[in-house]
Amino acid sequence: MDILKSEILRKRQLVEDRNLLVENKKYFKRSELAKKEEEAYFERCGYRIQPKEEDQKPLTSSNPVLELELAEEKLPMTLSRQEVIRRLRERGEPIRLFGETDYDAFQRLRKIEILTPEVNKGLRNDLKAALDKIDQQYLNEIVGGQEPGEEDTQNDLKVHEENTTIEELEALGESLGKGDDHKDMDIITKFLKFLLGVWAKELNAREDYVKRSVQGKLNSATQKQTESYLRPLFRKLRKRNLPADIKESITDIIKFMLQREYVKANDAYLQMAIGNAPWPIGVTMVGIHARTGREKIFSKHVAHVLNDETQRKYIQGLKRLMTICQKHFPTDPSKCVEYNAL
């Protein structure tokens, strides 16, 4: 017991000798103690530690004016602690640093909001973001100016030039679903990019006043949004890692679209997106015997639109391209689906 007491006293005396405790604080950083012990060791060995440039120069912010303003105006806390925590979490910042008081956290939040007002935008509306991009393009055109007689093409949508025609694609569609997965993925990619190009050319051919109208901006934003939704699908097709069940369903959809069997294509789309069996709820495996709901869990009965957000987006983008395909390449009314979306 005496040995333990003497060790505690030795540790306490060591902390007091190193001057680690400030008057108003009851704790110290272990790194400071290690640094002091290292300095004492070098002094005993006869070495002299040269102070680093970082230690000589005071820490300055990238915005000294802001630091001066925050230091001079010590405003009282105008936000509750709960609101400060919420705003810090929205920006991905820690709610409290080591040794930080509530007021210090409030001051840190003020500094973050002034320097980086929108660091993390969080979950944003994709269509709203596309509309903002369209508005910014028009604003840049107004600010930059335009020479008289110059053709206004800088705000046109990007067109995917596939150097192919619908007749060539229809001929390629005859070989879909014959067992060559790599060829099927190439045809799917080519046809979807062809439809995106057809859609972009149609929107670019509009009059300028139509492009600048609210509905015109909405149509342009929808096309941009659809293109961004389909990028993960194009990436999977290019890397040949598209899941087999989704690949089979998309192959059927594209084949029916090339045959202009839009009702059958819509049925295949619903089969992929929604499925025809509910997902069993509750325990499906008890003991050695599976319950009846277990046998319904396989790819054809699963709603892929519910799997994750990425799949939901490119399935939605595929549905929009089905509408565009029927609009530009019509067939008999009995083989068409009534669309009011676009």
Swiss-Prot record:
Predominant place of localization: nucleus
Gene3D superfamilies hit by this protein: Functional domain of the splicing factor Prp18 (1.20.940.10), Pre-mRNA processing factor 4 domain (4.10.280.110)
Keywords: Acetylation, mRNA processing, mRNA splicing, Nucleus, Spliceosome
Taxonomic superkingdom: Eukaryota
Function: Participates in the second step of pre-mRNA splicing.
GO biological process: generation of catalytic spliceosome for second transesterification step
Organism listed in the record: Pongo abelii (Sumatran orangutan)
Similarity field: Belongs to the PRP18 family.
Pfam families from the UniProt entry: Prp18, PRP4
Chain positions found as N-acetylmethionine: M1
A single Gene Ontology CC term: U2-type post-spliceosomal complex
Protein name: Pre-mRNA-splicing factor 18
Subcellular locations according to the entry: Nucleus speckle
Subunit details: Heterodimer with PPIH. Interacts with PRPF4 and with the spliceosome. Part of a complex containing U4/U6 snRNPs.
